[in-house]
Amino acid sequence: MDGIQQNAALLQQAGARITLHSDDPGGIQRLNQEAAKAMYDGRRAGIAVTRDQALRWITANPAWVLGIDSIAGTLEPGKMADVVVWSGDPFSVYTKALQVYNDGWLVYDRDDPAHQPRSDFELNQVSAPGSDR
């Protein structure tokens, strides 16, 4: 997908089940934006792609590929889920993540200092006197 964004739409039109992924640490955090770009590029190429289809490229379809669609990939009672609460349209570059839940636990809250991201590098480190970490 790096070179031809409408590839996802072309493959879907041909009957393939599309999944988007990235091996880049930055790219994996913005799969919603990658899905949006691929959706809009497909539309510009004349291929009808719905928002629901583009969202499935980064949710239900990857779960199906991994063989875990019976327990993950869609929001349904009894399924495991990691959920992001967005400030607006998840396909917009202006939308911000307000909260993130992993397996039902709040792990990030934009407005709560106790729920801010920490890297693995920071774990088990002693904070310097006077620092906030």
Provide a role label for each language-model segment.
Residues M1-W86, L106:
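His/Asp/Glu-enriched, well-ordered alpha-helical/loop segment
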Residues W64, E76-D120:
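C-terminal cap of metal-dependent C-N hydrolases
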Residues E122-R133:
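Short, solvent-exposed cationic patches
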Residues G46-V49, D111-H115, S127-P129:
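Short, surface-exposed, polar/charged, turn-prone segments marking secondary-structure boundaries
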